[in-house]
């Protein structure tokens, strides 16, 4: 098999399959991982989706330890440590207390 280089991979071209505009910064589920919209992506249009990097994201209640695997819960639109019914998001690069509203997540 021959592999042909396409792009560095920190961001990918993503076609919005929905009838709604994806907002810049919005989390997008890719089934087994997440991406973050780098720009607004209108319905059926192609836009930039970050798939590597560190992002500050809203989190569910509860503490998150440094290094913990974290997941994106689409129904709450928050990061959690609960894998059930959620999409793998990455890992916490810093601890977050229960009362913290956000957590820093390394995706990709």
Model-identified regions with their sequence ranges:
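Surface-exposed, low-hydrophobicity beta-strand/loop segments enriched in small/polar/acidic residues
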Residues: 1-108
């Amino acid at each position: 098999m021959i592999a042909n280089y396409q792009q560095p991979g920190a961001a990918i071209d993503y076609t919005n399959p929905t009838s709604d505009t994806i907002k810049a910064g919005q989390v997008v589920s890719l089934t087994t991982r997440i991406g973050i919209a780098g720009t607004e992506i209108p319905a059926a249009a192609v836009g930039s989706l970050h798939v590597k990097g560190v992002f500050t994201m809203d989190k569910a209640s509860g503490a998150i330890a440094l290094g913990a695997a974290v997941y994106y819960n689409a129904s709450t639109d928050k990061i959690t440590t609960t894998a059930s019914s959620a999409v793998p998001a990455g890992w916490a690069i810093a601890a977050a207390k229960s009362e913290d509203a956000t957590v820093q997540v390394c995706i990709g």
